[in-house]
Curated annotation (Swiss-Prot):
This is Cytochrome b6. Gene3D superfamilies: Cytochrome Bc1 Complex, Chain C (1.20.810.10). Its cofactor is heme b; heme c. Heme b 2 binds at residues 89, 190. The gene is petB. CDD domains: Cytochrome_b_N. Heme c binds at residue 38. Heme b 1 binds at residues 103, 205. It comes from Synechococcus sp. (strain CC9311).
Length: 218
């Protein structure tokens, strides 16, 4: 590149960033692609908003049955723009689920799950399950009446599974009944385990799309 800066030359010599930029900027976009093909990207944006606002709330949230509710109230009433951060987190969560559903329908209706993109579809469905699980675990964290009874009902569902049902219930609750161990496990799942899982499957999803390209029209 003519008249490039020393900083650019330093990175170019080591990482060949121009080749990376050319690869992204010259990627062919099929003529049949329309606005509905942006639904997956919008879902990603919602996830990034979720990550940023969720990270901000961890500075104030206290994952204990005695202080969880009061810490959420403190965030909403006393922290500067805390109400906005939590509201954006909730709104983007709803938007993420909506965009995900529409994205799945778009891919299904346009046949984007067919050979050779079966694994892309599998990773997408896996991410859909993780996203719904985000909603279940996050719903309980304020530890109000709605959150408590939601956890009690959801964690009791596996009891209907033969042989391993009771073990799964105890694994989710951290004991025989819903309590501090349950909240701790749901908090850990919501803020650490699931974000990492989703990030890994997102990377796999994007790499496969990058390799195979966008599916053709029906």
């Amino acid at each position: 590149m003519a008249n490039s800066s020393p900083v650019y030359d330093w990175f170019q010599e080591r990482l060949e960033i121009q080749d990376i930029a050319d690869d992204f900027s010259t990627k062919y976009v099929p003529p049949h692609v329309n606005i509905f093909y942006c639904l997956g990207g919008i879902t990603l944006v919602c996830f990034l908003i979720q990550f940023a606002t969720g990270f901000a709330m961890t500075f104030y949230y206290k994952p204990t049955v005695a202080e969880a509710y009061s810490s959420v109230q403190y965030l909403m009433t006393d922290v500067s723009f805390g109400w906005l951060i939590r509201s954006v987190h909730r709104w983007s969560a709803s938007m993420m689920v909506l965009m995900l559903i529409l994205h799945v329908f778009r891919v299904y209706l346009t046949g984007g799950f067919k050979r050779p993109r079966e694994l892309t579809w599998v990773t997408g469905v896996t991410m859909a399950v993780i996203t719904v699980s985000f909603g279940v675990t996050g719903y309980s964290l304020p530890w109000d009446q709605v959150g408590y009874w939601a956890v009690k009902i959801v964690s009791g569902v596996p009891a209907a599974i033969p042989v391993v049902g009771d073990f799964m219930v105890e694994l989710l609750r951290g004991g025989e009944s819903v309590g501090q161990s349950t909240l701790t496990r749901f908090y850990s799942l919501h803020t650490f385990v699931m974000p990492w899982l989703l990030a890994v499957f997102m990377l796999m999803h994007f790499l496969m799309i990058r390799k195979q390209g966008i599916s053709g029209p029906l």
